[in-house]
């Protein structure tokens, strides 16, 4: 069972955050392509949660959370345990749809988009409890 929580944030601020997030995700996708990954999904949404990017290289699947923040520490702190659980639930749904599921190795990564810097890719940012 998935819980959906809604915040009361002013519309202009939500729009600004949305477009900043979309730009950050596009930059992160470019970065992963540069590193030899194929982008399987962008903004994969389920009732349980959303995955910013799903990338593949061979049997390795990256479930990527993208955060645009001023510092790396802020980006890392922006991913709460609740976010991780939602990402895991959405990943389970995506993985269940893959024909080669049994062959896949899954990793949960973070890509931090920082001002005037290259994207910072943190492999295995968190691990699944499942």
From Swiss-Prot:
Stored Pfam families: UPF0102
A molecular-function term among this protein's GO annotations: nucleic acid binding
Lineage: superkingdom: Bacteria
InterPro entries reported in the protein's UniProt record: Restrct_endonuc-II-like (IPR011335), tRNA_endonuc-like_dom_sf (IPR011856), UPF0102_YraN-like (IPR003509)
Family membership noted in the UniProt record: Belongs to the UPF0102 family.
Protein name per its UniProtKB record: UPF0102 protein BT_1882
Organism from which the protein derives: Bartonella tribocorum (strain CIP 105476 / IBS 506)
Source organism phylogeny: Bacteria, Pseudomonadati, Pseudomonadota, Alphaproteobacteria, Hyphomicrobiales
């Amino acid at each position: 069972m998935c819980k959906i929580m809604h915040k009361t944030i002013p519309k202009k601020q939500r729009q600004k955050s949305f477009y900043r997030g979309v730009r950050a995700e596009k930059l992160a996708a470019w970065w992963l392509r540069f590193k030899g990954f194929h982008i399987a999904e962008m903004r994969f949404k389920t009732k349980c949660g959303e995955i910013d990017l799903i990338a593949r290289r061979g049997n390795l699947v990256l479930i990527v959370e993208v955060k645009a923040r001023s510092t790396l520490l802020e980006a890392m702190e922006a991913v709460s345990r609740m976010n991780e659980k939602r990402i895991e639930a959405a990943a389970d749904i995506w993985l269940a749809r893959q024909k080669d599921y049994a062959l896949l190795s899954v990793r949960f990564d973070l890509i931090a988009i920082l001002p005037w810097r290259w994207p910072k890719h943190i492999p295995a940012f968190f691990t699944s409890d499942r």
